[in-house]
Every structure is written in structure tokens, then in C-alpha cells.
Amino acid sequence: MAKAKFERTKPHVNIGTIGHVDHGKTTLTAAITKVLALKGKAQFMAYDQIDKAPEERERGITINTAHVEYETDARHYAHVDCPGHADYVKNMITGAAQMDGAILVVSAADGPMPQTREHILLARQVNVPYIVVFLNKVDMVDDPELIELVEMEVRELLSKYGYPGDEVPIVKGSALKALESPSQDPNAPEYQCILELMDVVDKYIPTPQRDVDKPFLMPIEDVFSITGRGTVVTGRVERGTLKTGEEVEIVGFAPEPRKTVVTGIEMFRKVLDEAVAGDNVGCLLRGIQKNEVERGQVLAKPGTIKPHTKFKAQVYVLTKEEGGRHTPFFNGYRPQFYFRTTDVTGTITLPEGVEMCMPGDNVEMTVELISPIAIESGLRFAIREGGRTVGAGSVTTIIE
């Protein structure tokens, strides 16, 4: 069976549901597909189809994630829902599902709970830029003042973690009522909260800048010299575009970036005028010897990324079952940090008052690398020990 072609007619946005266990994330996800399916803009996915999400592996970590897609009049969405709390933590830290915005589901009957807090904090740490709130199960609360109270609590919690709590849109409704309704009319009253939510998502979560429009960056995977022509570096363009004749910087492993000009670009042995995000290319560099550039450095638009050695990061430590360590590690632990295409040794400093880090923990730490790497906030990495992955992290702040 031939695969359907992905028609890129509408802007694309990645979103996901976050929130405490049993507050209705998966029910809401199913309800969204149901209501939009009635409008011909989605395929209905039942609760069970979403709940028994297939396992995926991202950076050596097994994560259960359900991916659903749907459209509104304005945009095309890819929506992620995870069955278990640990799956969310792993998903957000590894960047397996990069979210442009999140729908925070809070039960009006219970109010914010520990995982509500943890998911908001994680969203903040891994740079989920926008959150909208769905206040679920409002049919189970008789007193409107209680609903207002929960709403205030949610806004305060969002503000506490650096989101604009006062302006975050909050939609109230019952995902279960929408999911169980027999009505085939998309404008039935029980579907209104879902339509209102999608309207808010359309308007409040901006369309992200596409990778192509960002400044050029290509992690270097391999280096060769071509007799009579010079040095060629190969890799996959991560973002931006590069034209023949443009100046780039080689960043990493040296305190200062080094400038050079790309005098030729090739893909599949054919000459290109321009490389764009996603292309696997070879770039011919002017005046660079083969021993002056290596795997693990990046080619970048001048001035857009700098080499750093010290940063703060949010890290998930793999459990023994996931192939991670069997024992905790302590302050001063020195594993390898795998950034893009290479490993660099670094030393870990745990937060004050934290003695050790257990397998399965989610922890903030400071890392100091032995050599500088092209790093920016939001960059993902794996922590490895003897070739196996023992953790996954995301850079939250650069120190030096």
C-alpha cells in the first residue's frame, strides 16, 4: 500500500497534553479527535488506542508515547499523549516530542496535584514556550466558587514557574461527556468546550519558526581531504540554509570559533548551490587542513553559537531496567556527555543538599566539560558510561 503524501498546506504545530495522572489527559486527547472527526478534520482515536501507546526508543531510552494528528481550520497538529508519568519526564527531557505548546489538564474536582506542578516545572525547564489550560470534570463540581478557586490556584502555579498565569487561557468542560456523547452534530452543546479549546490553541500558541528560517548549523560527522581541492566536512544540516561562497564558523574544542568560507556543497555526489535543514551534505572548506577540523565540532553562521564548558541541565537518570546504572552516583561523577555527534568528558555537581542521584531520578545539575562544545540553551544530550547511555538531559542555563 502506497503511503499517503503529506500535504503541506497548513502551518504545522506540535502540541501535547500534560498534567496529573487521572485528570483526563488521554480522555481529552480522544475527545479532540472525536469532535474534529465530526468536522472531517481528524480520524477518531478511541481512548484505548491512545492509552496503549507503542514503545519508542529515543537516545537509548524506552518511552511510551501516543501520537495523534488532526487539523483545525487554521493549522495541522501533531499531538503527543503519554500514558505514564515517567514517560512524560523522559519524553520532555530527551526531546522525543518537542512541544511548541502544551495543554495542561487539571481536574476541577481535585485542583492542582504534585504532577501538575512537576509537569509545569519540566515544561519551563525544557523550553515549552506556551501553555493553555483545560479545566476538566467541571460537571463533578456543584459549587462555581470552587471552580474559581481551582482556576486561581492554577494561575498562581503557572506564574510561580515563569508562565504568564494571568493571561493563560483556561477552558472549562468535561472531556468524558464529549467523548461519551452519541451526538453526530459537531455543534452539540457537550462538544463546545472542545471546539473552544481548539480555538484557544489556534490563537494563543503561535506557529513556531521553521528550522529552515533559523540560523545555519551543521554538526560535523566526518572529515576528508580531497586531493587538489581541500578539506570536506560532512553532516546533516540541523537548521537554516547555506549557500556556496558563504562564510561559516567552525565551533567547538577550541576557546574561539574559527572562520572559513564554504567553496562548494555536494549532496549524493551532485553539486548544490544551497543546502537546507534536513539535507545530508559535504562542504568544501577554504584554507582548512584535515587535521584542523574534527567530528563533534559544528559549522555555524558566524556569531550565532559559542563554545562553552559549564552549564546547568535537567537530567533524567535511567533505571537498571532501562539499561542504566544499578547504583547511584555522587557529586564529582565523571561520565561522558554525548552532544550531537561526539562524547566529551565532564564533571557533575549536584544541587546543594543533594548527596547522590538514584537511577530513575529527575535532577538538576551543573556540568563542567573538559573541552568546549557549541552549546545553547535547550540543547539535548545523553550521558554515557563505557558506551552505554545512563542518562538524558537538556541544557537549561549556560554558565561559561
From Swiss-Prot:
The keyword RNA-binding does not apply. Keywords: Cytoplasm, Elongation factor, GTP-binding, Hydrolase, Magnesium, Metal-binding, Nucleotide-binding, Protein biosynthesis. SUPFAM superfamilies: EF-Tu/eEF-1alpha/eIF2-gamma C-terminal domain, P-loop containing nucleoside triphosphate hydrolases, Translation proteins. Residues 60-64 are annotated as: G2. Pfam families: GTP_EFTU, GTP_EFTU_D2, GTP_EFTU_D3. CDD domains: EF_Tu (cd01884), EFTU_II (cd03697), EFTU_III (cd03707). Residues 81-84 are annotated as: G3. InterPro entries: EF-Tu_GTP-bd, EF-Tu_GTPase, EFTu-like_2, EFTU_2, G_TR_CS, P-loop_NTPase, Small_GTP-bd, T_Tr_GTP-bd_dom. It catalyses: GTP + H2O = GDP + phosphate + H(+). It comes from the Bacteria. Its main location: cytoplasm. Residues 10-209 form the tr-type G domain. One of its GO terms (molecular function) is GTPase activity. Residues 19-26 are annotated as: G1. GTP hydrolase that promotes the GTP-dependent binding of aminoacyl-tRNA to the A-site of ribosomes during protein biosynthesis. NCBIfam families: EF-Tu (TIGR00485), PRK00049.1 (NF000766), PRK12735.1 (NF009372), PRK12736.1 (NF009373), small_GTP (TIGR00231). Belongs to the TRAFAC class translation factor GTPase superfamily. Classic translation factor GTPase family. EF-Tu/EF-1A subfamily. Monomer. This is Elongation factor Tu. It comes from Caldicellulosiruptor saccharolyticus (strain ATCC 43494 / DSM 8903 / Tp8T 6331).
